[in-house]
């Protein structure tokens, strides 16, 4: 077991960075890191699961801050001053979580190190929800990064497993004009009671295509005159927004919550892949359809929202055993298709909602109040499905090696083989 220690660097010692991608910061407890054995992919994942189970009662913990973006994941000390780890997204292989032990873990390799030197980094939280959001953010980052790298594989229409609730974002489309996204009015439960929770309104989706009276602007104005709004209007700073809200007696202290996690990842994607972002056609399947609220993160990960079904199934065939995709059947609101990666390939199952509004798997008597409960029940239960559902996901954008002098090495999804190393993590001491 290795822990962050004296080898860590202060964030201020890294020098000024010309580009700072938007990120999402979350708190957690860092337990430690351990090397991954040199075994077959599935066997290595199984041994990692056993090791995580053995470490569930480990008392060696350290408060840290995890910062997610489409460029990667950074781990800072609890005060946010010391950078303990930095992993580019392309070097993170696998992510998983265990609700019973409140554990979140991911497998990654170090920069410029071979694919044989992989390490698993373990974090815990005080309750399952805390580690679940860490897992969701990392897995959705995997998917969004893949979508930006492969825009030709996008879906023509986005699947939706369930209503997203009160935080809907409505596209406004007109011929020749990119769709704008308008947020619904804020409700009481969307007002933060914490002044530190304020996030700038400039992180909201582009509102530049709408005038002050709510009408659409001409195409020339929408594309040119409002560009500065999309890129961040200085007059929409957090301080000014908060002061204006207090003066108008909308709130006493505090401010509006920021956009959703997915919205911030979307903006990060625009910055990380500007060429792909601009080349992506506006409309169904485009970047605007990737905007979603926190409550829909789980469903969009299950369905690999934004990717065509054939491409999603192709990626599923190369994932770990138990990985699955869950999407609604076209033309119906009461049936879903559950595809599970097994030892024999991808096995389809049918999920339906009965007359009582409860969810069931075809040919199985058990009923569940929600899709989440159904998935949780069939995770780790050998007798219910041919292969139990897995909480782990492989990163489809993982690269076994870094860029060389002659260009980028080909990507692959069999990175857990050839992993045998007792070397210490760089910068972890």
UniProtKB/Swiss-Prot annotation:
GO annotations of cellular component type: postsynaptic density
**Ranges for domain SH2:** 302-398
> Where does tissue-level expression of this protein occur?
Highly expressed in brain, particularly in Purkinjie cells in the cerebellum and the cornu ammonis of the hippocampus.
Read off the SMART domains from this record. PTB
Known Gene3D superfamilies for this protein?
Pleckstrin-homology domain (PH domain)/Phosphotyrosine-binding domain (PTB) (2.30.29.30), SH2 domain (3.30.505.10)
Alphabetically ordered keywords of this record? SH2 domain, Synapse
Q: Chief subcellular site?
A: other
Q: Where in the cell is it found?
A: Postsynaptic density
Its biological purpose is as follows: May be involved in synaptic plasticity regulation through the control of Rac-GTP levels.
What is known about its subunit structure?
Answer: Interacts with BCR.
UniProt protein name: SH2 domain-containing protein 5
What is the species listed in this Swiss-Prot or TrEMBL entry? Mus musculus
From the broadest rank down, the organism's phylogenetic lineage runs: Eukaryota, Metazoa, Chordata, Craniata, Vertebrata
Gene field:
Sh2d5
